[in-house]
Amino acid sequence: MAGSPRVYNSQHCGFSVAVMRFLLLLLTAVLISLAWLSPDHSYPWLTFASEMLSFAAFLSLLALFLNRPLELPRVQLLALPVVFIPMIQWGFGLVVDFSSALLSSAYLLGFWLTMLLGYNLSRSSADRERMFTLSSYLLFAVALLTSLIACIQWLNLESHVPGVMNLYSHRPYANFAQPNNMSTFLILGLLGCLYLAEKQKLKQYYIWPVAALIVFAITLSQSRTAWVFGLFFIIYWTYKSWRYPTHLKRYAVLLWAIGFFAVGLLFPRFTRLIQKLKEGNVVQTSSVVERASAGHERLGIWQQMLDAIHQKPWTGYGWNQTSIAELSSMSSNTIHVWFTSAHNVVLDLLVWNGWLLGGLITICILIWICWLNVHAKTTESIIACLMVSAVWIHTLLEYPLQYAYFLLPVGFLMGLIQAQTPDQTARSVPVSVIRSIWVIGIMLLALIWRDYNLYKVNSLRILKNQPANIEIWGSSKILVLTEFDQRLYWLKLSPVAPLTSTELDQIEKMVQNKATPYNLQKYAQLLLANHQFEKAQQQIAYLNRLHKKDYTLQDLQQANASAVESSK
């Protein structure tokens, strides 16, 4: 009898741990779901709400290890130095802004840590199946909601449904505000359906109608990235299902893939039919041929970025500073568009870091992905590889990994795949380190929320010619997001203010990194007011070419005269 209290306490403790684990996993699922479904896309940080929710989900998942150590595979240590590259570049003056470098390093660290979390939560085959099943259920549910939202937009009914974004183009995008991002996410949901069907976790009559709706919503997006992945899927699944037999018949799965292409070809006719039956307007869509023959701007972007790399082959232009590379290589610009990404992750890495470092990072990523794929032999790891491939294929054409709601889940999935690779030596990360990271993460997230909202309030006051003196938490000073602090100064600055050459050079770096029409025009006005006519003419040329404007030096002189008059 003397041992009974200890047995009871042990059982009670185990029950409490299980409940806490369940609650944290549930909270993580809710937060990342809200990140995917958030309709809040407001200027200047369009995905601010989704990014905050994604990192909150990450911290919720990290809380599972506040009382137990994380196992760190030694191979993972090779990737850790990459986390600090943006901050090192800022220290040497290559990255213009501190907060840009800090956030870049924070995103890289988040990606690295979610890989560790995926690895540690999937060490055994039972844990791996459990985690991937939960992930597939989550993707299944959110993809269903996203598909319904896309259909609502396609039918022009979004104004009648709360929580749904208004559609401003002919390609539905649900609440992602970007059709290709929606398409890639729906592919993840479709692969979740495949896993649930393969492992018989749900009845077929639940899965296939939802899968059909998801395929239809992907077609609505008219994403060419989805077509590329469809071809990749056919090849990959044919090979893997031949090597490792599956429950589902190979021909049945491949018929679904072929059906996706058939729906795309027939979709314009289907749209016209629905329009007749509905006796109203539905969103007009392009045909497959029209979509395939459009959007060749990427070729011009890639060519210009190669020229930019040749200009700075060793150091690059700094992490997340593709815009500076574009303005530095305007002599080879063939497209009239301002871009902040090379629309290809390999080119972005080379632009940011130069041939040597960027090439080394690219080669390591390629080797790592191939290594994971070679060891993908179970249903969980094979379908996880397909999910990761969907996002990585997207990165070759756009920039999905700049969004935390893709970056962090991809890290988690890659950690899950890595957990089933054999003979990995690992060391333990002390609990104290995990707790420190968690506390710093909470504090950083809170400060970012504060700084961003402080900027939004005070920037509106500046535009209304009111003093920017609103305080949050007892201060009106921006602490972490220094880029927004510079923007407040920039908004307050008169376009005819007398400045030194050093001050103008500092502003030039900021403008090159954010070459919006407002920034280019105002900087040109400043140069003109400070008698730097050639540079002013150059900024006008950038403005006209990148944003399809038609300004002249005389227009700026008139604008400056008006600014002088209004300041009297």
Swiss-Prot record:
It is a multi-pass membrane protein. This is General O-oligosaccharyltransferase. Its EC number is 2.4.-.-. Keywords: Cell membrane, Glycosyltransferase, Membrane, Transferase, Transmembrane, Transmembrane helix. Pfam families: PglL_A, Wzy_C, Wzy_C_2. The chain crosses the membrane at residues 17-37, 46-66, 78-98, 101-121, 132-152, 176-196, 214-234, 251-271, 349-369, 376-396, 397-417, 429-449. The gene is pglL1. Catalyzes the O-glycosylation of multiple protein targets. Is responsible for general protein glycosylation within A.baylyi ADP1. Does not act as an O-antigen ligase. GO terms for cellular component: plasma membrane. InterPro entries: O-antigen_ligase-rel_domated, PglL_A, WaaL-like, Wzy_C_2. It comes from Acinetobacter baylyi (strain ATCC 33305 / BD413 / ADP1). Disruption phenotype: Cells lacking this gene lose the ability to glycosylate substrate proteins and their glycoproteome is highly affected. Belongs to the PglL O-oligosaccharyltransferase family. GO terms for biological process: protein glycosylation. It is found in: Cell membrane. Signal peptide: none annotated. It comes from the Bacteria. One of its GO terms (molecular function) is glycosyltransferase activity. Its main location: membrane. It is an enzyme of class 2 (transferase).
